[in-house]
Amino acid sequence: MLKITAIPALQDNYIWAIQQGQEVMIVDPAQADPVFHFLAKNKLNLTTILITHYHQDHIGGIAGLQATYPDLTIYGSHEVAQYVNHIVQAGDHLHLLNSDVEVINSAGHTAQHISFLFAQQYLFCGDALFSAGCGRVFTGDYQAQFNTLQRFKTLPESTLVFPAHEYTLTNLKFAASVLPNNNDIREAQARAETLRAQQQPTLPSTIKQELRINPFLQADNLAEFITLRQQKDQY
């Protein structure tokens, strides 16, 4: 059984720690110090880093962690080749923490953004998918991002979704503006407000929940997705 913990970093990042026994791996370390604190507090051994894409708020802690843990195994796509020692691509399967981990093409936010799906149960998706939202399409390749979302829609509804940012309340506000008759969104807003008031993460979400509240997953075609994404960019 994997234990998954959110390590807050920067303003709104989550570094996800995936633990089995005393061994732990992390996803997208924005900073090193919060990870060091987590490891010391829980007496854990860091062995592996997974990187979804090259943006600084996802790789900023790598050098500091490597300085202390020089034998780290670091996985990522070609766009982060300078930071990793194992390059992976969509369709690859890794065996980590006694689990099958599938590498999923999640392009759009960046050209070679990837996600990691553990045991068909846990999706670590970086900035490709947020609760009630998705990442900005910095590449300009809206087709790629739309295709990424279609892939996520095919995952089991019970799949837990672990994005890299706490954007849920802002995203739900936008979602409510474009889907004003969606009761699921209003209920999600109330839950998220309660959690944030208690300084708790709103994440993980599930694919089932995202299909109900995420306007980008409800876009029926590319043109509709582009319209929504451009509206959100200006929101």
From Swiss-Prot:
Binding of Zn(2+) 2, residues: 57-58, 127, 165
Biological pathway: Secondary metabolite metabolism; methylglyoxal degradation; (R)-lactate from methylglyoxal: step 2/2
EC number: 3.1.2.6
UniProt cross-references to Pfam families, sorted A to Z: HAGH_C, Lactamase_B
Gene3D superfamilies reported for this sequence: Ribonuclease Z/Hydroxyacylglutathione hydrolase-like (3.60.15.10)
Name of the top EC class for this enzyme: hydrolase
Keyword line: Hydrolase, Metal-binding, Zinc
Cofactor binding: number and manner: Binds 2 Zn(2+) ions per subunit.
GO molecular function, one term: metal ion binding
InterPro entries with a match to the protein in the record: Clx_II_MBL, Glyoxalase_II_hydrolase, HAGH_C, Hydroxyacylglutathione_Hdrlase, Metallo-B-lactamas, RibonucZ/Hydroxyglut_hydro
Co-factor requirement: Zn(2+)
Catalytic activity: an S-(2-hydroxyacyl)glutathione + H2O = a 2-hydroxy carboxylate + glutathione + H(+)
Residues annotated for Zn(2+) 1 binding in this entry: 53, 55, 109, 127
Keyword ATP-binding attributed: no
Oligomer status and interactors: Monomer.
Family in the record: Belongs to the metallo-beta-lactamase superfamily. Glyoxalase II family.
Protein name: Hydroxyacylglutathione hydrolase
Organism: Haemophilus ducreyi (strain 35000HP / ATCC 700724)
Lineage summary: Bacteria, Pseudomonadati, Pseudomonadota, Gammaproteobacteria, Pasteurellales
